[in-house]
Amino acid sequence: PFYFGLYGGSAMAGFLESDPDAAPFFQALGYQPTARHLVYQCDLNDHHVPVSVRLMEIRRKMELRAVAQPDPLTWWWSTRYGRLESLRFLLGPKAGGLAAAGVTVVALDHYLSKWQSQSIGLTDLAVPKAEQRQGFGQALILGVMRRLRDELFTQVECHAPDGNEAAKGLLESCGFKQVDAGSVFQRPSD
């Protein structure tokens, strides 16, 4: 869909810094950057899963579940993901109960010829406030990446707002590397 951006990827990042003509063009027209998003990727062929006691404890108590789509299905979800293959992964207690974290996985098959890799995008990562800073987000992402590698995907992409240190730290702790950044431009009101 159009709203996944001009460059492809798992989310809208704005105009990428790797496109050197974009920023000068928009600034010459009076637009100013208003937000910046970082683009992270992880090569699953080279990925080494971090090991820690906390992650082992989470894996012992929690399980990864896949759900096809949200319930109830909303107009917003349908317009954003309806034409793409997507799946929601939840990390929840093996004994049952509410999920401690969730992320949506979006197939990026449209970019196979350009990127030369079987890629997947991660978006809509959510960890309830009460569950944050306990390793659930990291355990979820690492579990999803392990599953994707088993399904023969070779690259995972995720975006994070610049300035969101928690998201940046989480992605980097899972083996992601920043590969680009994008700026959203807006014309100042007169």
What are these regions (language model features)?
Residues 35-39, 86, 179-184:
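Short hydrophobic/aromatic beta-strand or adjacent loop that forms the aromatic wall/cage
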Residues 2-35, 138, 162-180:
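Conserved active-site alpha-helix within GNAT-family acetyltransferase domains
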